[in-house]
């Protein structure tokens, strides 16, 4: 009976030690692993990355995130599960609202920016419903407001947003060379 009590506690402890976020770059794809699921993007679907900026009077405010522009949204949406789409909608809402606030200084925000619709039809005519449609609408609004489809918050990265964006673009330009350079920098003789 006592050992039956310790096993669930031990399993709970092990689960709590799992990483909450992880990004994996291979020669063929970018994978975002989250405690609640994962999404992947083939190299061919990655357009570019950068730091999203929003106009703030005469200046620009950089979001504390890396923006990713996708080549084919339908290809991306087919790879994401509703569970992680819903979690990302919630977790990234504060970043999205920072963008919306800068575009709605007079208080006249379009209602679709504040609440994502549960229906979405892509440019290819593919219809989505539920959480995937809500996520697709968020992607559409992000692209309209920042030029990027996805956000990778600084909290999920292992380096600064500028370094990570540079790394993603280097990976886009030549994934084989980028992966080799990362492996070489991790070898013992190349460490400081």
Predicted segments with their positions:
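Ordered hydrophobic segments in well-structured contexts
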Residues: 22-25, 63-67, 149-155
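Hydrophobic alpha-helical transmembrane segments
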Residues: 1-3, 127
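Terminal and domain-flanking low-complexity segments
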Residues: 82-192
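Generic secondary-structure microfeatures
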Residues: 34, 50-53, 70-74, 100, ...
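Conserved beta-hairpin
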Residues: 8-54
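N-terminal membrane-targeting/pre-transmembrane regions
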Residues: 1, 69-71, 153, 157
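A general structural signal for short secondary-structure junctions and capping/turn motifs
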Residues: 22, 57-60, 141-142
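Short, surface-exposed polybasic-and-hydrophobic patches located at secondary-structure transitions
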Residues: 59-81
